[in-house]
C-alpha cells in the first residue's frame, strides 16, 4: 500500500497530538497532578 507523502507526516503529528490530548484529559478527570 502506497500512502501519499502528505499522509505520513500528518499521521506522525496528529496521532501524538491525540495521544497527548487524551492523556491530558485523563489526568484532569482523575485529578492526578
UniProtKB/Swiss-Prot annotation:
Q: Which family does it belong to?
A: Belongs to the PsaI family.
- Pfam family of this protein, just one? PSI_8
Q: Where are the transmembrane segments?
A: 6-26
Q: Name one GO biological process term.
A: photosynthesis
Explain the purpose of this protein. Answer: May help in the organization of the PsaL subunit.
Keyword annotations from UniProtKB, A to Z: Chloroplast, Membrane, Photosynthesis, Photosystem I, Plastid, Thylakoid, Transmembrane, Transmembrane helix
Q: Which organism is it from?
A: Spinacia oleracea (Spinach)
Q: What's the protein here called?
A: Photosystem I reaction center subunit VIII
Q: Which InterPro entries match?
A: PSI_PsaI, PSI_PsaI_sf
Amino acid at each position: 500500500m502506497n500512502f501519499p507523502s502528505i499522509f505520513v507526516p500528518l499521521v506522525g503529528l496528529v496521532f501524538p497530538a491525540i495521544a497527548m490530548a487524551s492523556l491530558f484529559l485523563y489526568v484532569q478527570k482523575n485529578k492526578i497532578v
